[in-house]
């Protein structure tokens, strides 16, 4: 049994503003539907830096103080492993805007 495997690290962030939560309607055929903003972690990038970057790219918001609140992993049909780090924050600045990833509200 090998100790090495193909793994992709991704992240998602629940952004809360009082009694509202930001969601994204993703248009990607690989991951469509209503979800939280997030994406992949680039080689050499920290998990925190990755979630801050992805939220900025997909929503126009700059988040701070993201807190890890869960981790989920699964294998696809080809034994490729995905590991998702779930974060949450109530700290952000900027103006909400949709991106080519999908609409946000």
Residue ranges of each PLM-predicted region?
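Conserved Nudix-box catalytic region and its N-terminal flanking loop in Nudix hydrolases
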Residues: 17-57
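Conserved N-terminal beta-strand and adjoining loop/helix that marks the start
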Residues: 1-21, 37
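Short connector loops at helix/strand junctions that flank enzyme active sites
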Residues: 8, 16, 36, 63, ...
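Short secondary-structure boundary/capping segments
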Residues: 5, 13-14, 26, 33, ...
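Conserved hydrophobic "DFG−1" position in protein kinase catalytic cores
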Residues: 15-16, 23, 88-91
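Unchanged
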Residues: 41-64, 74-105
């Amino acid at each position: 049994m090998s100790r090495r495997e193909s793994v992709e690290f991704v992240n998602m962030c629940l952004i809360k503003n009082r009694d509202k939560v930001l969601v994204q309607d993703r248009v990607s055929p690989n991951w469509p539907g209503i979800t939280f903003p997030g994406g992949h972690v680039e080689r050499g990038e920290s998990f925190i830096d990755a979630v801050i970057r992805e939220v900025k790219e997909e929503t126009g918001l700059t988040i701070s103080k993201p807190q890890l609140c869960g981790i989920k992993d699964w294998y696809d049909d080809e034994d490729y492993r995905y590991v998702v780090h779930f974060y949450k924050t109530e700290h952000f600045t900027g103006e909400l805007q949709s991106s080519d990833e999908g609409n946000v509200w």
